A protein has these predicted regions:
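A short, glycine/small-residue-rich beta-strand->loop->alpha-helix junction that serves as a flexible
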Residues: 8-17, 162, 276-282
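Histidine-anchored nucleotide/phosphate-binding helix
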Residues: 12-34, 174, 291-306
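Conserved N-terminal ligand/cofactor-binding loop architecture of enzyme catalytic domains
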Residues: 30-142, 189-249, 441-450, 467, ...
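Conserved nucleotide-sugar donor-interacting segment of glycosyltransferase catalytic cores
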Residues: 144-199
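A donor-sugar binding/catalytic signature common to diverse glycosyltransferases
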Residues: 169, 348-396
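Conserved catalytic-core segment of nucleotide-activated headgroup transferases in glycan assembly
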Residues: 239-334
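Long, C-terminal catalytic modules of enzymes
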Residues: 308, 394, 398-483
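Nucleotide-activated donor-binding/catalytic signature segment of Leloir-type glycosyltransferases, i.e.
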Residues: 330-347
């Protein structure tokens, strides 16, 4: 079998995951190929501004990885970007127009939108104001699509392995596979830093795939181990243990509650989410069910329950939104002081999210892991969005606003069965496959086959001085690259 990789994201552990999978396929006797960018893309997820030093670092890491693998991977150089392809609009009227743009049957605009939304942390990105960036992102997506498709046809590839699957440098490769009838798989971080997640035929954001994996994991694990490991996921999160990503509650003060918190009231905690990862996903339902968005949901819930002075809601803004100035955060800030029965807890507030959850009558989420956590800790959880635990019955999933309000008003609302939360916790903690060759030292560093995958010393020194020069140029607004 001929397996094709487009390793366009070099930070650890993702490049090392590519290397791990390449080594596996080679060990199984397959032919492995890699389409390598050596600066041809005008922008990418790891190097938005196409800085020469970062580009050189990426190439140096890739070359070292190939050396560690014994030069057994056939490298297919990415062709230079040609003139701007026909069919690209001069500008896109808004982010929705960008999302719907297709080129030769491939919805490359969706991948460009996903990358740009993440870059600017703005789900309603002004595509007119950022016209130049939009054009570069679309051009990068088209170039990945065209180059990867040509490479796959040239070698007659049987399978492709792609990182993540939502960005402009990865999703177009999936489009190419689908047009050619080639199978593909994607990879992402696993449940801990010592694991990687390799998914056949779909992407990490696929809710149905998650449901199948959760069920298979639970059935294949002895009951006592499943219960213990499922519980560990939740106790570790509450203890701020960082398994696969950074803890957003680490800076909060344990047991701290909002000022004037009244335990005698029927308190409802609402935990929102960061929208940037969910706003441009192919095949994923709208982030919020029944309502236009989370702001609409919060305002309608608060306004409808205003007739009962014993009900008070607390909106905990996700800590990941701290310091941002975006459409989402501006609209959330506008809720401050608007309703007497709503307290808004800012993202950088030291209020303990777990203490707030613990002392609430019910918890409302839009996809946050807190929805499953609330169930585990014995609290009624109401899910108004979509989450990887959608099918686990660990949260109430109302079908309309009236049902939502009925759940909120109900005194003594029982939590959903804890078993669903345990199933999800087991899967999330043990999600993926243990690395055999990569040894993680932290969430973003490690060694592969006992060696650090980094450029050789002379090149590292050059990269260091180039970065110093680039940072100085950026401070003085005198950049000479990517114009």
């Amino acid at each position: 079998m001929k397996v094709l990789f487009p390793p366009t994201y070099f930070p650890s552990p993702h490049l090392e995951t590519d290397l791990e999978l390449m080594a596996d396929y080679l060990e199984q006797g397959h032919e492995v190929y890699a389409v390598q960018c050596r600066g041809e893309l005008p922008t990418c997820f790891a190097n938005w501004e196409h800085r020469p030093a970062v580009c050189l670092e990426c190439r140096g890491r890739f070359d070292m990885g190939m050396e560690i693998l014994g030069e057994r991977v056939t490298i297919l150089p990415m062709s230079p970007v040609e003139d701007t392809p026909e069919g690209i609009p001069a500008q896109f009227s808004d982010i929705d127009a960008l999302k719907s743009f297709t080129w030769k049957g491939a919805p490359v605009g969706l991948s460009a939108a996903s990358s740009l939304i993440t870059k600017h942390k703005e789900h309603r990105l002004d595509t007119i104001a950022h016209q130049k960036e939009v054009q570069k992102e679309v051009l990068a997506a088209i170039h990945v699509f065209r180059t990867f498709k040509n490479a796959a046809e040239t070698i007659d590839a049987d399978h492709a392995v792609i990182f993540n699957g939502r960005f402009s440098t990865s999703l177009p490769a999936i489009f190419a596979c689908e047009q050619l009838g080639i199978t593909y798989s994607t990879h992402e971080r696993g449940g801990t830093k010592d694991r990687y997640w390799h998914i056949q035929g779909t992407v990490p954001h696929d809710l149905e795939n998650a449901a199948q994996e959760i069920d298979a994991k639970w059935k294949s694990t002895p009951e006592s181990d499943a219960m213990r490991r499922g519980s560990q996921f939740f106790t570790d999160r509450r203890a701020r243990v960082e398994h696969s990503w950074y803890s957003f509650t680490k800076q909060q003060q344990l047991e701290r509650l909002p000022p004037c918190f009244d335990p005698a009231k029927h308190n409802i905690s609402i935990f929102n989410t960061s929208l940037e990862e969910m706003e441009a996903l192919r095949g994923r339902p709208a982030p919020v069910r029944m309502y236009r968005d989370e702001i609409d949901a919060v305002t309608r819930m608060v306004e409808t329950t205003m007739d009962d002075p014993s009900i008070h809601s607390y909106l905990r803004i996700h800590p990941h939104l701290a310091g941002r100035d975006s459409t989402q955060t501006r609209r959330l800030r506008e809720l401050h002081g608007r309703y007497c029965n709503l307290t808004v807890v800012d993202p950088d507030s030291p209020v303990d999210s777990y203490a707030l959850m613990e002392r609430s009558a019910a918890v409302v989420t839009f996809g946050s892991t807190m929805g499953a956590e609330a169930c585990y800790w014995g609290k009624p959880s109401i899910l108004l969005g979509h989450a990887l635990y959608d099918h686990e019955d660990c949260a109430y999933r109302p079908v309309d606003h009236d049902e939502t309000i009925g759940l909120i008003r109900q005194r003594g609302l029982p939590p959903r069965p804890r078993n669903g939360a345990l199933r999800y916790g087991l899967w999330d903690l043990e999600r993926g496959t243990p690395f055999r060759r990569f040894q993680a030292n932290s969430l973003g560093d490690g060694t592969f086959e006992g060696k650090r995958v980094r450029p050789r010393q002379p090149l590292r020194l050059l990269i260091f001085f180039m970065k110093v020069l680039e940072h100085a140029s950026m401070r003085l607004n005198l950049r000479w690259w990517n114009k």
